[in-house]
Amino acid sequence: MRRLLYTINVTLDGCVDHRAVDATEELHAHAASVLAGADALLFGRVTYQMMEGAWRAPHSDAMPAETQQFARAIDAADKFVASSTLASVDWNAQLMTGDLADAVRRIKDGPGDYVYVGGVQLPTALADLGLIDEYEFVVHPTVAGHGPRPFDGLSHPLDLTLTGAEEWRSGAVARRYVPRATA
């Protein structure tokens, strides 16, 4: 059974607006590695459309090598999209239908290691359903003072156990957690 890995960039004050953090070469390399290792990506409509607009090929040759690596990884990946408003998707994507929990369980039942989950609203719903197996928060040494926060509206606390950490020259730190019940 595949794990569901949720990873998100977050500022010190909890903002997850991608424009509030500095996407350094080392962070793009880390993200590319995570994406390339995933069996598939799982997005809600907003994140899917944002990522497609930013990373669908063709890519600019002016991008740094690490950014090109990230762009290639996300462009080539198989994707699942949870949406009640889209009628169809492309870009190596399948539109999920029916009950969210059932659809995600079917994805997790597939072969492989893990499925990457991105975004803000969809991961909150998945956390509420107890479907996320691992969380990675890439915490940036920045205070945004505004913006969306992860897990707004979560119906219960998440009790997590730290399983790993990695720090970069920029001062950003990736911290990985699993739900305490599965630690």
Language-model features: where?
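Enzymes that bind and transform nitrogen-containing heteroaromatic metabolites
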Residues: 1-183
